[in-house]
């Protein structure tokens, strides 16, 4: 299905999935990586893509946060509104500080499920395209507001903290689960409180 559209893809080994593909879309050097997964025991295809924010752009965000916190809050609010208006599922990762998760935008994820009863080639391709345009919109917002950056991905505190919390000392790791377990930590709406947006 994907090869007829000249989309590059590579199958990944994943014991939690019946199928796990890494694809590049759109064609050409500006393509981004997307994941297409059929989780075991589910009647759906999950399509998603993660974007890390450039380290130089994160530094510029920190400057704006210090110089004009209202401008920063408004910019972040508008980004959230843009993601909501796109109609896709999304999650953002903000930098951590002593006072909480109020740092710069470090990464964001866009995703969308397609249930088998609605799965067609057209629906899969339109989903990938919709996710791409959602990503592209936020990427352009970041570049417009904070420049091109330094060309190197910046840190993502959530990922570092997750790595540290999964390391075990003194006891073996539990066996790998046979079913897909959903990580709700990146879901939008969990404990929804608009005050947390600031």
PLM-predicted stretches and their roles:
Residues 66-87, 116-149:
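Ampiphathic alpha-helical segments that act as solvent-exposed interaction surfaces
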Residues 101-109, 128, 133-135:
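Short, well-structured beta-strand
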Residues 43-48, 102-116:
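Glycine-rich, often proline-containing surface loops adjacent to acidic residues and nearby aromatics
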């Amino acid at each position: 299905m994907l090869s007829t559209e000249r989309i590059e893809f590579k199958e990944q080994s994943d014991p939690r999935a019946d199928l796990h593909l890494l694809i590049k879309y759109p064609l050409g050097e500006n393509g981004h990586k997307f994941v297409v997964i059929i989780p075991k025991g589910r009647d759906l295809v999950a399509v998603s893509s993660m974007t890390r924010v450039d380290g130089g752009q994160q530094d510029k965000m920190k400057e704006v946060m210090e110089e004009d916190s209202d401008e920063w809050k408004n910019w972040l609010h508008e980004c959230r509104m843009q993601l909501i208006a796109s109609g896709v599922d999304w999650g953002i990762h903000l930098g951590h500080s002593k006072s909480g998760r109020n740092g710069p935008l470090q990464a964001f994820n866009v995703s969308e499920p397609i249930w088998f009863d609605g799965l067609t080639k057209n629906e899969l391709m339109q989903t990938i395209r919709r996710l791409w345009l959602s990503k592209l919109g936020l990427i352009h917002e970041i570049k417009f507001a904070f420049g091109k950056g330094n060309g190197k991905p910046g840190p993502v505190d959530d990922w570092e903290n997750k790595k540290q919390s999964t390391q075990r000392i003194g006891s073996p790791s539990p066996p790998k689960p046979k079913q897909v377990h959903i990580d709700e930590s990146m879901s939008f709406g969990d404990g929804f409180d608009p005050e947390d947006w600031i």
